Amino acid sequence: MKKLLGGLLSCILGGWLLTACTSDDDLQQILEGKGYVKLALNTNTGFQTKAVDEEEYKDLNNYTVQILKGGKVVEGMEWKYPEMPTEQIELTNGAYELKAFYGKDEAASRQSMYVEGKKTFNINSDKVTAEVTCKPVCGKVTVKFDSKMADYFNDYSITFQTKALGDMNISWTKNDTEPIYMKVEDKEMISATYNLIDKQGKQAKIGNKTYELSPLKHLIVNVVPAVSNGQIGISIEVDESTNDHEVDITIPSDWI
């Protein structure tokens, strides 16, 4: 009986020692002053309107991934997504930022949009996971000039300004059809100036109009001429939102 108990105690003690040694080994794998991070990347590129399909921005393989420290890319820590390490990455202790992006970072563009995600994380002799979701930094603007505009005006356009554009601007002319992707902050108020030339060549600018725009939002501006009371009606609609706006712009009565 004593031999049996002794054997059981030896097995239990041996198992405990094995467990303890395994745990110690795991801890010893993290060198002093260092830690590990595992990276994960997602995308959320769909505008709430679902009006168009930006498929290429959903493909993770198009993205560049970086780890930054103090605003600078850590040496050897930049990859295209297919080459991004799937195992844990060793880093010295400190504060870092995971950044992933695709596209050209421009204040406004008709050709493309810029999609980016950032996430800060800290290494403190431990193992962490840093996950980032990439989203467009821009809102989308579409202008729809009613066909009757040509009955009253030789030329017409809208000039937009945003914080990112600074002293510059971008215009939507009467023949434009492609949406403009504008880099904006959340609930930024963008400004619009309406430029009109009537059939007699008289010019007018209607400015000081502002509209709210956020990343992933789609602003649709409908411009319709009204042939009474010398007014042009401007209907502003935000897709999939109940916050529609109606704005009337008064111009001289002899224009119509």
Model-assigned labels for residue ranges:
Residues 1-20:
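Sec-dependent bacterial lipoprotein signal peptides
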Residues 21-256:
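Extracytoplasmic cysteine-anchoring/structural motifs
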